[in-house]
Curated annotation (Swiss-Prot):
This is Inactive carboxypeptidase-like protein X2. Residues 71-136 are annotated as: Disordered. The gene is Cpxm2. Residues 325-648 form the Peptidase M14 domain. GO terms for molecular function: zinc ion binding. Belongs to the peptidase M14 family. It comes from Mus musculus. Residues 82-98 have a biased composition (Basic residues).
Length: 764
């Protein structure tokens, strides 16, 4: 009794200490319920790097697991006391394989489907409650989308690695299809590369929520000079980044076959989907003459987590009822027909020609009077798919078609005004041959270039005639008479010959742009997030990058900014660069030549050969995003696509007529201080894109007296009306009179010579 009496105070003290400890653990657990995710992340990282050895947390495991852990700790302590050698049995937890097997053994299909559903839910709940052991699911295989390494949905903070050679080869560069810069020894290299070549290296993705992992896609290092790739690897998963379970193949660890070269992606599906938060890739072999380097994408389905405030806050949804899927050629044509049937009064389907393999290049016109050019109404176009593997632009334009039709039918005032005041042309797929090749590869396995070129191997983006060189050579010859105008520069004869290396698709676009008096256009591309404006070609010889502005540089800057500033991500200073270039210093815009020089681009050709101001719009880091990404990409670009079309109504517009009120075609419109002219269309109407300000504008035409007036451009949307009435010159009137009476006018020089000859004969 005395012993019991003395033991009671000690027992009470121990119970009090346990209560305090449990309260501390509860307080610590409560931190996970805070809405500020980043506080949780900092706490987790401190624990991750501060405790390299796993420490069991009492509240995160079930009571049955406490006994297993105690048994395991005893087995681990005894060898250390006997010689510090751990037997192989102590490496694997005892209960983890049993639990894994238990969950994997789902019952066969039975009559009571509700019972099976309840058991599946209970198993997933057990997986979510057990933060230490991942769960394998052997249910019907679900096709899971990529987590988003390539699309940057997975942030740099979610990527970790055992070691890295340097910052430019860190874990944050281990993204599928990421591209290296010209100088590969900078911060923007083409893969994650381990600091050492041994079997202890790994790269890890933190999904930040329970995820059903189903597969891994890998690539080698993107480099012009080096050959580095991983030829085999293991896959491990975890719920706490300390206790890891290796994907098994029977009783042993499964070795996945990796890459045999550095660019073609290789997909490996897990034999059984694994539910966990973390996934780790552990290279086992690599190219003999290279290093451990890889790029990757993870396939997985995030499990619903209503208690996670961070993910609910960042989920992207759309209210537009559109067809969010990838459309092959047949499906694209069918969607166009559906839109045309929905809105027959404002749409028209036509084709501008055929591809190398005979596929028609379909376009859709949207106008209140489809099929005709209305005097005073500007023409606008969108083009996508010049590179067949840059699929996002194609799908965005198909979504735009459907959206404009729906909103016009719903009497959306903004869309109705746009359709009634603009003639819109949309060409979703300029290179359908290349697209079909990329479509066969799929959104993740096509690599960076499959389907980029036409069927005959031509890059349409730089297949147009180089008119820049003709213009600049003429400008450099100041003493010689001007042979090349500053606009409507003629296409060289060699380019028009049948033997010229010109794609069928390129010739079709040129004929299309010569036929329709486009004022503004945008060609949608992929692989970056920026708007590029001309010139695209540098003026200085032997330079690959140099800012080369057009005479309308201020207008082009505004047009580019109008798209970028209304895009959800382009001007976001917090966003990560896609590959190597940081375009935030110019608010998501760039002069094409200062980025990289391109001779014969569509932008430069359009500016120098037609009236059209053309820009390249790079709509996403991922050229070919998964279908699940399309709603978010539509939300990112929808407002920008509409705002850019509305810019066709900025500047001045008018009609150039003669005294009888007839429109004068091919009249030249010049703006003082801008060394670039435009011309009137067949009805005498014109549109000149200008920023707000006061301008001195001149209209001139052959056989007419030049007319000049001041035109004011305001800040409000809508072009300022600036009409001209030209009077014929005396010589033109004489010629007109003589032609009316069937006689040719007598030229004055020849008449004077005849009079002189008569006088000489009379004197002689």
């Amino acid at each position: 009794m005395a012993r019991l009496g003395t033991a009671c105070p000690a027992l009470a003290l121990a119970l009090a200490l346990v209560a305090v400890a449990l309260a501390g653990v509860r307080a610590q657990g409560a931190a996970f319920e805070e809405p500020d995710y980043y506080s949780q992340e900092l706490w987790r990282r401190g624990r991750y790097y501060g405790h390299p050895e796993p420490e069991p947390e009492q509240e995160l495991f079930s009571p049955s697991m406490h006994e297993d852990l105690r048994v395991e700790e005893q087995e681990q302590q005894e060898p250390h006391q006997q010689g510090h050698r751990t037997p192989k049995k102590a490496i694997k937890p005892k209960k983890a394989p049993k639990r894994e097997k238990l969950v994997a053994e789902t019952p066969p299909p039975g009559k009571n489907s509700n019972r099976k559903g309840r058991r599946s839910k209970n198993l997933e709940k057990a997986a979510s409650d057990d933060h230490g052991v991942p769960v394998a699911h052997e249910d019907v295989r679900e096709s899971c989308p990529p987590l988003g390494l390539e699309t940057l949905k997975i942030t740099d903070f979610q990527l970790h690695a055992s070691t890295s050679k340097r910052y430019g080869l860190g874990a944050h560069r281990g993204r599928l299809n990421i591209q290296a810069g010209i100088n590969e020894n900078d911060f923007y290299d083409g893969a994650w590369c381990a600091g050492r070549n041994d079997l202890h290296q790994w790269i890890e993705v933190d999904a930040r929520r329970l995820t059903k992992f189903t597969g891994v896609i890998t690539q080698g290092r993107n480099s012009l000079w080096l050959s580095d790739w991983v030829t085999s690897y293991k896959v491990m998963v975890s719920n706490d980044s300390h206790t890891w379970v290796t994907v098994k193949n029977g009783s042993g660890d499964m070795i996945f076959e990796g890459n045999s070269e550095k660019e073609i992606p290789v997909l490996n599906e897990l034999p059984v989907p694994m539910v966990a938060r973390y996934i780790r890739i552990n290279p086992q072999s690599w190219f003999d003459n290279g290093s451990i380097c890889m790029r990757m994408e993870i396939l997985g389905c995030p499990l619903p987590d209503p208690n996670n405030y961070y993910h609910r806050r960042n989920e992207m949804t759309t209210t537009d009822d559109l067809d969010f899927k990838h459309h092959n050629y047949k499906e694209m044509r069918q969607l166009m027909k559906v839109v045309n049937e929905m809105c027959p009064n404002i749409t028209r389907i036509y084709n501008i020609g055929k591809s190398h393999q005979g596929l028609k290049l379909y376009a859709v016109e949207i106008s209140d009077h489809p099929g005709e050019h209305e005097v005073g109404e500007p023409e606008f176009h969108y083009i996508a798919g010049a590179h067949g593997n840059e699929v996002l632009g194609r799908e965005l334009l198909l979504l735009l078609l459907h959206f404009l039709c729906q909103e016009y039918s719903a009497q959306n005032a903004r869309i109705v005004r746009l359709v009634e005041e603009t003639r819109i042309h949309i060409l979703p797929s300029l290179n359908p041959d290349g697209y079909e090749k990329a479509y066969e590869g799929g959104s993740e396995l096509g690599g960076w270039s499959l389907g980029r070129w036409t069927h005959d191997g031509i890059d349409i983006n730089n297949n147009f005639p180089d008119l820049n060189s003709l213009l600049w050579e003429a400008e450099d010859q100041q003493n010689a008479p001007r042979k090349v105008p500053n606009h409507y520069i003629a296409i060289p004869e060699w380019f028009l010959s049948e033997n010229a290396t010109v794609a069928t698709e390129t010739r079709a676009v040129i004929a299309w742009m010569e036929k329709i008096p486009f004022v503004l256009g945008g060609n949608l591309q992929g692989g970056e997030l920026v708007v590029a404006y001309p010139y695209d070609m540098v003026r200085s010889l032997w330079k690959t990058q140099e800012h080369t502005p057009t005479p309308d540089d201020h207008v082009f800057r505004w047009l580019a900014y109008s798209y970028a500033s209304t895009h959800r991500l382009m001007t976001d200073a917090r966003r990560r660069v896609c590959h190597t270039e940081d375009f935030q210093k110019e608010e998501g815009t760039v002069n094409g030549a200062s980025w990289h020089t391109v001779a014969g681009s569509l932008n430069d050709f359009s500016y120098l050969h037609t009236n059209c101001f053309e820009l390249s719009i790079y709509v996403g880091c991922d050229k070919y995003p998964h279908e699940s990404e399309l709603p978010e990409e539509w939300e990112n670009n929808r407002e920008s696509l509409i705002v850019f079309m509305e810019q066709v109504h900025r500047g001045i517009k008018g009609i150039v007529r003669d005294l009888q009120g007839k429109g004068i075609s091919n009249a030249v419109i010049s703006v003082e201080g801008v060394n670039h002219d435009i011309r009137t269309a067949s009805d005498g109407d014109y549109w000149r894109l200008l920023n707000p300000g006061e301008y001195v504008v001149t209209a001139k035409a052959e056989g007419f007296i030049t007319s000049t007036k001041n035109c004011m451009v305001g800040y409000d949307m809508g072009a300022t009306r600036c009409d001209f009435t030209l009077t014929k010159t005396n010589l033109a009137r004489i010629r007109e009179i003589m032609e009316t009476f069937g006689k040719q006018p007598v030229s004055l020089p020849s008449r004077r010579l005849k009079l002189r000859g008569r006088k000489r004969r009379q004197r002689g």
